Amino acid sequence: MFDRLAVLPQYLLPKQAITLLAGRVAGARGGKWTTRLIEWFVKRYKVNMREAANPEVASYATFNDFFTRALQAGARPLARADLICPVDGAISQFGAMAGQQIFQAKGHHYSSTALVGGDAALAAQFDDGHFATLYLSPRDYHRIHMPCDGVLRRMIYVPGALFSVNPTTALGVPGLFARNERVVCVFESARGPFVLVLVGATIVGSMATVWHGVVNPPRSTAVREWRYDEQPVRLKQGEEMGRFLLGSTVVMLFPKGPLQFNPAWSPGAAIRLGEAMARQPPLA
């Protein structure tokens, strides 16, 4: 009951309008005003600028430039692992799926079909598979990288709500990650198909991929899809695949099989890009 009461204001707030305003502010070239905003943000969230490729706050023309900053070369060495962690952040949940059911938080599950925008055939490829939900806080590095080598097959934009995706909201909003706006990226690998879902949230101005650029805005009320069978996009493990312009959550789906997550992982634990995420033998 407390969890639902805690998120009640989010049902009442004009989330779309707030997000639109935040996106305009983040993209504005405000000179000294922008620099002061970034300085406040760095101090408020204890952002480690020493590991940024460009640590000089005043050199960023917009807040978005700062928020999507690159890291210094070598700041995130890649583990020798079948699957590496694709982001900096914290583990929300991970584990095995029961059929199409994905565990969100205590008392809450949602379906893989709902997550991928209603495509039952796509979701069926991951029945009884594995999932990982990773939360990116405001202080984190906000580029998303490949957990393994992969070939892009499809990208699906799914319109939705813009609830916050912090742990409190995950406890209080049923089906949160299948309700929010999201971008579903479908890949093929030597270990079978996998899905990377970029989940939007309140104040997340937009999401972008390296092959498409900014996916939203413009925001749509209908599901949109792009296919890449004739012009496949090939990405190596550790390569950037996308980014959040203001932060959110990544959900990954893997098919049924002998996947073993890192035994050091646990819900709520901090994670870093490049660390070992799981063992997953190649297909025979």
Swiss-Prot record:
EC number(s) per entry: 4.1.1.65
Active-site residues, record numbering mapped to chain: 88 (charge relay system), 145 (charge relay system), 248 (charge relay system), 248 (schiff-base intermediate with substrate)
Site residues, Cleavage (non-hydrolytic): 247-248
Compartment(s): Cell membrane
Pyruvic acid (Ser) carried by residues: 248
Chief subcellular location: membrane
Function: Catalyzes the formation of phosphatidylethanolamine (PtdEtn) from phosphatidylserine (PtdSer).
Protein name (record): Phosphatidylserine decarboxylase proenzyme
Organism expressing this protein natively: Albidiferax ferrireducens (strain ATCC BAA-621 / DSM 15236 / T118)
Organism taxonomic ancestry: Bacteria, Pseudomonadati, Pseudomonadota, Betaproteobacteria, Burkholderiales
